[in-house]
C-alpha cells in the first residue's frame, strides 16, 4: 500500500535538506533529487519500524511578519 506524504526541501550551505512533517523524518543530499530520494528511503524505513495510525494531513499555509530592513 502506498501513502502520500509531504516533503519540504530547503538548502543549507551546500546541501539540500528534505523533511516529512507528517512523520518527522528528515534527510539530506547534494541535490534536491538526492535529498528527496533519501527522505523517501528514510521515511519508508521508519514506517516499517514504527507504523502510524491514520491521521489528518497538516495544514500548510503562509504568514507575514514585519521585518525592519
Language model segments and positions:
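Short aromatic-glycine-(Arg/Gly/Cys) micro-motifs in beta-strand/loop hairpins
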Residues: 3, 8-22
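Short, charged, surface-exposed hinge/linker loops at domain edges
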Residues: 1-8, 37-69
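A short, exposed loop/beta-hairpin motif centered on an aromatic-Gly-Thr core
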Residues: 23-32
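Short aromatic/hydrophobic contact patches that present stacked aromatics
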Residues: 17, 26, 64
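N-terminal start-of-chain detector that recognizes signal peptides
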Residues: 18, 34-39
Amino acid at each position: 500500500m502506498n501513502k502520500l506524504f509531504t516533503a519540504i526541501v530547503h538548502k543549507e550551505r551546500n546541501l539540500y535538506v528534505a523533511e516529512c512533517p507528517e512523520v518527522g523524518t528528515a534527510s539530506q543530499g547534494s541535490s534536491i533529487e538526492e535529498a528527496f530520494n533519501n527522505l523517501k528511503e528514510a521515511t519508508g524505513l521508519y514506517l516499517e519500524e514504527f507504523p502510524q495510525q491514520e491521521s489528518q494531513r497538516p495544514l500548510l499555509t503562509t504568514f507575514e511578519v514585519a521585518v525592519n530592513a
